[in-house]
A protein has these predicted regions:
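Amphipathic alpha-helical repeat scaffolds of TPR domains
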Residues: 20-28, 54-76, 100-120, 145-163, ...
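Internal amphipathic alpha-helical repeat/solenoid segments
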Residues: 37-59, 63-65, 70-77, 81-85, ...
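Solenoidal tandem-repeat scaffolds enriched in leucines and small polar residues
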Residues: 160-164, 172-180, 206
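Helix-turn-helix repeat elements of alpha-solenoid scaffolds
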Residues: 29-45, 78-94, 125-135, 167-176, ...
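Alpha-helical junction/boundary sensor with strong preference for TPR arrays
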Residues: 43-50, 67, 93, 100, ...
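Bacterial N-terminal signal peptides
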Residues: 8-16
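Positively charged n-region of N-terminal signal peptides that target proteins for export
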Residues: 1-4
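TPR/TPR-like (Sel1-like) alpha-helical repeat modules
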Residues: 127-134, 169-181, 215-232, 251-278
Length: 299
């Protein structure tokens, strides 16, 4: 009898394993940027195959994610088509949250809204900023998701884009951008993330002396901030103090200026690209822009 029960248990596990949706193909195809339309079409088919709310949520947030890329691929002149895709992506994220609340759904909801806002123009989409911040707080605090480069990048771009009177903050943006760079997965390049941080630093333009002082202040605030991850990571630049050395240089943060570090970051991003065996179309576009900035900032 025990043997029969064991056999039935093994059989049940095998059946469940077969029945469970396999996202390996769509995730690999998405990460390699091979064919976003194929990813979209495959996920639409998988949606009808999803048996549980958990599976539906997994399909839906991935649909939301690929809508961002599909919208980005359209020409700037195709604004209505872009708006439609970003709105579709937001709708998928909302459905994912309804099916089974999860960090990725909140993240890609914000990513779609953010792209919608960038397309519309920041001054025409200010009312979306605070709801985005609240959703991203859910990612960092309710789900304690601190290793999502995309989440930190979205926060960085949001705080960098907003005027100060509407909640923008260049220092918070740089801290979030540093967190985004520090959490880039090993299987992607994300040159645009490095470029974003470099551009923010170049624009801030602090001297080495000022950096040493201000990063020291941030370190104190980082240590004292206990209310939320969202608030704490606004001081991430000072997490390890002015003597910290980021991955792209052996020079201490307090011993170089913003613009010196910005150039080093771009050269590091260039090296990451050169070392990679596979490049997406987005990687190639970022590489060209990075090379142009290196040439401009080196003169």
């Amino acid at each position: 009898m025990k043997k029969l029960v064991s056999m039935l248990a093994v059989l049940l596990i095998a059946v469940l394993a077969i029945a469970a949706l396999d996202f390996t193909f769509v995730d690999d195809t998405y990460n390699k940027d091979i064919d976003d339309q194929k990813v979209y079409d495959t996920l639409k088919g998988m949606l009808s195959e999803a048996k549980t709310n958990e599976e539906k949520a997994e399909v839906l947030w991935r649909l939301s994610r690929v809508c961002v890329d599909l919208g980005d691929e359209l020409d700037d002149g195709e604004k209505n088509a872009k708006f439609a895709l970003y709105e579709e992506g937001e709708a998928y994220a909302l459905q994912s949250i309804e099916a089974n609340p999860n960090a990725m759904a909140y993240l890609w909801k914000c990513a779609n809204i953010g792209r919608w806002g960038q397309t519309k123009g920041i001054m025409n989409s200010l009312k979306k900023a605070d709801p985005m911040k609240e959703d991203l707080k859910v990612v960092t605090d309710r789900f304690n998701c601190l290793d999502s480069s995309e989440c930190w990048y979205t926060l960085a771009i949001l705080f960098d884009s907003l005027p100060g009177v509407f909640g923008g903050d260049s220092n918070f943006a740089i801290s979030y951008a540093r967190a985004a760079c520090d959490t880039i997965p090993s299987y992607v390049i994300y040159g645009g993330t490095y470029k974003a941080l470099a551009e923010m630093l170049y624009k801030r333009d602090w001297s080495a002396k000022k950096r040493a002082t201000e990063i020291g202040k941030m370190q104190t605030k980082w240590s004292k901030e206990t209310k939320s991850n969202y608030a704490k990571y606004g001081y991430y630049e000072g997490a390890n103090g002015a003597d910290a050395t980021p991955i792209w240089t052996k020079t201490k943060l307090g011993s170089m200026s913003d613009r010196q570090e910005a150039l080093v970051i771009l050269k590091y991003a260039q090296a990451v690209y050169d070392a990679a065996k596979y490049h997406t179309d987005g990687d190639e576009d970022n590489y060209e822009e990075i090379q142009e900035l290196i040439a401009e900032w080196s003169t």
